[in-house]
């Protein structure tokens, strides 16, 4: 871990400290900001080497997930060595890591293996293997999404992927839910529009809500017979839903799809609450806002026009909302987000989320400029430790993508 006071400017608040966590000559990255990759005590997290902000190459032997121990000055310890390791999730108790081994091929299938290992590298075991067409699926599973999500009770792990037969364009994608105690898997969602699901379990301890998953539906997308995208989204854009992890109780969130506002494709639960948050882009006025809402009964794909929708623009007190990737702490009280200008290296902002769901964030604090080139493979993707005391981000300001940490406000 290397101190980086040169990344702090006169505009940064007093006491801010920036550290570069990775320093290798090959790209290193944090996991996508919505992933559950922190221990609940905020002491250890997972990141990866020979990687980028949206995943890694499953055939890259240099790719590894690492445990970063903040109590030991950011000491890194490899936690995976297998080829094709992907989609990590730390259990809510913080004792074990779940991850997948991707040995699949579109149209052919292969093996998708759910594994578990203690964070000290011991007791590694296979939990479940998918090596044939899952009942109800249109084809073999392949192209696993580089993120998984784990339920608040640690009993279920979900991941999405491609279900094409290798000969049909615009074939279905689907969402798998693995039941850890029984070592079984179920296909709970399937269709051509579920190509970029971003599944995220609700972290609420409420028995019913703990089965809920935020899922993203990309309308108007196109892909070839191998699942490669020719168009990620079309028409009025994506909309965001919530579904129970048995595939029932589909609900809507009132965002986007009105011809002016669109969902960027970044959303999350606000901490362990049942409130949800997304970043939107508007044509007029040209802004990128942070809008919270709660779910509504499913009536279709109406977006913000969904009847009964109640929205709260958390970013309305910011003088120039231009927000994209964001995350909250575990309690849903603190938020970190990146912002434009993209051609100026971007910016990191911090704010406090009101408990009153009608109020906006009022204490916006500019932290720093990450110095990012803001290409897809260098996205900043900021997130917070569970206790909200420290933030994390990616940057290629050195010429090579690296992982960073910023703190000093608490």
What are these model-derived regions, one by one?
Residues 265, 270-290, 296-301, 311-360:
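Loop/turn-rich, solvent-exposed surfaces of beta-rich toroidal or solenoidal domains
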Residues 254-263, 312-326, 358-386:
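Conserved blade-ending motifs and adjacent loop-strand segments that build the rim/top face
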Residues 378-410:
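Blade-level signature of beta-propeller repeat domains, shared across WD40, Kelch, NHL, RCC1
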Residues 27, 31-34, 52-102:
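Blade-loop segments of beta-propeller domains
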Residues 35-44, 49, 88-101, 142, ...:
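Blade-terminus and WD-like Trp-Asp/Gly-His loop motifs, strongest in beta-propeller folds
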Residues 9-29, 362-365:
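A short helix->beta-strand "capping" segment at the edge of beta-propeller domains
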